[in-house]
Amino acid sequence: MAQDPADGVYFGLMSGTSMDGVDGVAVRFAQGKPSVVLAEAFVGFAAGLRDALFALQQPGDNEIEREALAANALATRYAVCCHDLLHNSRVPAAEVRAIGVHGQTVRHRPEKGYTRQINNPALLAEMMHIDVIADFRSRDVAAGGQGAPLVPAFHATVFGAKNETRVVCNLGGISNITILNATGSVRGFDCGPANALLDEWAQRHLGKPFDENGHFAAGGQVDRTLLNALLDEPFFGQQPPKSTGRDLFNADWLDAKLPPFAALDHADVQATLVALTAVTVAREIERHASDAKAVYVCGGGARNPEILKALQQALEDSGVSGVPVMTTDALGVPPSQVEPLAFAWLAMRCVARLPGNLPAVTGASAERVLGAIYPR
């Protein structure tokens, strides 16, 4: 009788509603059925873990409920985007190997061993009838890494050059840079806040989700005293590998710095936040990539001329002169496409069982295949 290709030894683990511990078995399958149980084990839960699990189990409109419902809503919006892609590309769903979906980061605490990107990839797979690959960051964190940034490996694939050092700067909610050395080595790390604080301030004082074309910031003046107060943040002095997020750089962080500057015009604060983004990026380039021949910007901030102008000036002020700042359009990839392309690439790597992280970037102990597969 032919052997089932899925036959072999499997472990099964189950911790039930009693929350007393986890039961496990090691079982060999033959012809798709358990042929022999090789071992069993039980590991009890400590009282502290049981108490934590019972507390999390309480029903109601709590954080767990809100996260789950938000994840469902996100998956629905992701499905709309996928349908648009199918329509616009005229590619049948059956030809799509996989959807690589990052999810929405709501917590990033690698120092505590976790990062959380909410999403419901099972629901997305059910709606699209296409394999979905998600949860890219957690394996890197499990291997001792920061789980971020992940895009430098992709940047190296598409933007690297043998004869010069290049910097790719992503200006999303958080800024990060990838250093593509002429030698072929790659470094990358988060620099600090970008659109996260700029958008927060624009929403508060303009009633708009972002500062379109940087007009709000252009109407203000950089306040050097406030800028220095903002720069007095320990994260900016940390050595890479490092990553950050809205856990640190959020409205509360900004508001805690502002009381001595209550007389400042709102536009001046916005201009100073632009300067903060530019200076923190420029300082890292000066420290780690002073031989760069060009800086290529992607992400939402690439469409803000005030940030690009400020970054060019900050580089000059940092002693990195004559290095042009331009968008990734110059390399043939529109700034808005870089990150979704990166997660399509990571999905492809997962399908091929190839590593997607760079330990030199994230600090992980070794290369790892990233992502969890949710079959169609």
UniProtKB/Swiss-Prot annotation:
Q: Which GO terms describe its biological process?
A: 1,6-anhydro-N-acetyl-beta-muramic acid catabolic process; amino sugar metabolic process; peptidoglycan turnover
Q: Which SUPFAM superfamilies match?
A: Actin-like ATPase domain
Instruction: List ligand-binding residues for ATP.
Output: G16, T17, S18, M19, D20, G21, V22, D23
Gene3D superfamilies for the chain? 3.30.420.40
Pfam families the UniProt entry points to: AnmK
User: Which UniProt keyword terms apply here?
Assistant: ATP-binding, Carbohydrate metabolism, Kinase, Nucleotide-binding, Transferase
- Gene Ontology molecular function, alphabetical: ATP binding; kinase activity; phosphotransferase activity, alcohol group as acceptor
Q: In which pathway does it act?
A: Amino-sugar metabolism; 1,6-anhydro-N-acetylmuramate degradation; Cell wall biogenesis; peptidoglycan recycling
> Where does the sequence pass through the membrane?
none
Q: Which reaction does it catalyse?
A: 1,6-anhydro-N-acetyl-beta-muramate + ATP + H2O = N-acetyl-D-muramate 6-phosphate + ADP + H(+)
Q: What's this protein's function?
A: Catalyzes the specific phosphorylation of 1,6-anhydro-N-acetylmuramic acid (anhMurNAc) with the simultaneous cleavage of the 1,6-anhydro ring, generating MurNAc-6-P. Is required for the utilization of anhMurNAc either imported from the medium or derived from its own cell wall murein, and thus plays a role in cell wall recycling.
What is stated as this protein's family in its record? Belongs to the anhydro-N-acetylmuramic acid kinase family.
Q: What is this protein called?
A: Anhydro-N-acetylmuramic acid kinase
